[in-house]
Amino acid sequence: MCFVKSAFAVSIVANDYDLFPTHTETETWNAHIQSTYITTTKDHFDDPYRGENSLLNKGDISRSYSGTVTGYLGVHLWQGAEYYVNPEAFIGIPFSGLKGMSGIPNGEMQKGTEIPAIYYLARSYIRQTVNLGGETVHLHDGANQLSTNVTSERIQLTYGVFSLLDYFDNNTISHDPRTQFLNWSIMTAGAYDFAADSRGYTYGGVIEYFKNEWTLRAAHVAMPRVPNQIDLDNSLTHDYADQVEITHDQKFYDQPGKIRFLVFRNHGFMGSYKDTLFQIGTPDLLSVRRSGTNKVGYVINGEQTITDHLGAFLRWSWNDGKSETEAFTDISHSLSGGLVLKGSLWQRENDAIGLGFAINGINESEIQYLKRGGLTPFLGDGTMNYNTEQTLELYYSAHLFKGAFATLDYQHMNNPGYNQDRGPVDFISLRLHYEL
């Protein structure tokens, strides 16, 4: 859903910079491109009853797919200033209209069916860096990054249109559905209801402070005017989100790792599950939506290289779950983690095997709402026998030639949509990715 770019470098937990650079080339402009195609099938599963927003067993499409093509253009403006723009095309059709699950099995899938393809500007922003001193750091050429030199202590300001996941809840091992884990609740923190339109992008500003092994980030960005829709409140005054994250780089037995702590608050037009429970008959979120509703939450996010070939990650995320999901998915608490093994162990340097899991849950008031037949943008079986939604994901990513990768991905999901009367269901995906 939200499109980020990460690299699988020599160390499992890697940086895109050199603290003591041996080369210091800088660029005035650059251009990159990526293309990703994902096709997914699912098996038949136990389906004793269904509701309006159920994952369908019979009567669903036989194959879901998505495709994206993104251009990355960057230009140097003046000292410390850069401008980036990303034109993008998307085509896709999800299983069951993207309903019946919280951990959607394709991280590239947007909210809604798009056939034929749509075209839009995914990102358009300016970045200003103010160097404050310290060691020289060389930032390598890449998507949305000009090759340049900065100092280890610096302030970076970004303003425009971007994805919050470009900056927050990063993780070298699990962050990019184009090259890593596919499931929504494994690729990022499931309970992080990050501000975004239905394509995964937002508008606003980010400020970052870097000093050696510490990084502090804060952002004020737009939320959708109506939950899970495309239209954002670009005034940043009525429907908005604030987040702060601190990151620390560390060493464990001489192996690199990172720990991140993120807090967020969403302020916008949302309905309260508790308010619906006073209604007679089937509860309805739309009728209790109110402006100025708040949702708060946090994320703890760690990654660690264990050996030169093996890395691990773990995330715990939580939000208060009192109000409806405004931008991501129906999860109010989530534990996810996994391991990635590099192919250098079997002389395939750029291959990787990943094994990950997610255990997702929702607030008690949402459980009661769904049991009484209520609907959310993602869930609604007519009733439910609640249990956590549990997903196991396994993938093998094979390097084909420079910039090209093919991935075979398997996911096993228990209790889809938090309903232990339904499922389990298995998904098999093939992903083709190219970047230049």
Question: Which sequence ranges carry the predicted segments?
Answer:
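Outer membrane beta-barrel transmembrane domains
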Residues: 245-247, 262-292, 313, 320, ...
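Residues on the lipid-exposed face of transmembrane beta-strands in outer-membrane beta-barrel proteins
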Residues: 33, 69-75, 124-128, 159, ...
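Signature for the C-terminal beta-barrel architecture of outer-membrane proteins
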Residues: 184-312, 316-323, 330, 341
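Surface-exposed coil loops of outer-membrane beta-barrel proteins
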Residues: 100-116, 136-241, 245, 284, ...
